[in-house]
């Protein structure tokens, strides 16, 4: 599987951890892991996926944090942690994701800590999707990231918030 560029999995309700070998797929560009309701953590080696452009971790409700090694994902453009109910803070060095353009964090109900200081280094970040409570966390950051748009997600399932 060394040339695999995209992995998309959904509804692995009983999987508590991902295989460590997943982090050795060098050419991987997209990783979609959704509805893994018992997944508690990502492998620390996640940062070795240096070609990853899209990381979608939707509805991994037991996922409590993102590994600090995520700072190695220098090509990451889209990070979607929507409905990861247990994430309480973003990684300290999230600002090293120098190509991050879109961050979707709608439904991260435990995320109430101030954003890491390094967040102001996300110069390419253009679009954040979150609820009203999390949007307040971005207010101090927006004075540094002047092109950033924080979209407050609606309670209904309209897709109008998606970037065109």
What are these regions (language model features)?
Residues 1-113, 117-164:
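Predominantly recognizes leucine-rich repeat
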């Amino acid at each position: 599987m060394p040339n695999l560029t995209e992995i998309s999995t959904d509804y692995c309700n009983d999987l508590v951890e991902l295989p460590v070998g997943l982090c050795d797929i060098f050419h991987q560009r997209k990783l979609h892991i959704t509805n893994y309701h018992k997944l508690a953590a990502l492998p620390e080696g996640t940062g070795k996926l240096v070609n990853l452009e899209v990381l979608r971790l939707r509805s991994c409700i037991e996922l409590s944090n993102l590994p600090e090694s995520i700072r190695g994902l220098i090509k990451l453009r889209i990070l979607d942690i929507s409905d990861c109910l247990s994430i309480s803070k973003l990684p300290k060095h999230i600002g090293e994701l120098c190509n991050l353009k879109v961050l979707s964090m709608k439904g991260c109900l435990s995320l109430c800590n101030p954003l890491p200081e390094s967040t102001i280094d996300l110069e390419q970040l253009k679009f954040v999707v979150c609820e009203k409570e999390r949007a307040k966390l971005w207010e101090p950051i927006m004075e540094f990231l002047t092109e950033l748009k924080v979209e407050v997600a609606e309670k209904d399932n309209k897709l109008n918030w998606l970037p065109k």
